[in-house]
UniProtKB/Swiss-Prot annotation:
Keywords: Chloroplast, Plastid, Ribonucleoprotein, Ribosomal protein
Keyword Plastid among record annotations: yes
GO molecular function: structural constituent of ribosome
Ribosomal protein in keyword set: yes
InterPro entries on file: Ribosomal_bL35, Ribosomal_bL35-like, Ribosomal_bL35_CS, Ribosomal_bL35_sf
Top-rank lineage group of the source organism: Eukaryota
Protein's recorded name: Large ribosomal subunit protein bL35c
Origin species: Porphyra purpurea (Red seaweed)
PANTHER family: 54S RIBOSOMAL PROTEIN BL35M, LARGE RIBOSOMAL SUBUNIT PROTEIN BL35M
Cellular component terms (Gene Ontology): chloroplast; large ribosomal subunit
Chief location bin: plastid
Amino acid sequence: MPKLKTSKAIAKRFKVSSSGKILRHKASKSHLLQKKSSKHRRHLSSTCQVDSRDAKNISINLPYL
């Protein structure tokens, strides 16, 4: 049986925490930032946990992380 391959597109977008939770960055942080308040931009900088329904599909594509 061949080795499982890591999906590089998924590997660069998600991170697995030490407790095993999958983390992601929030959207809307790349451009059109001048109309967003500083508080809103600061809030977008934080990471959040992936929904459990999506975590299963992501973990299948990240076999070694």
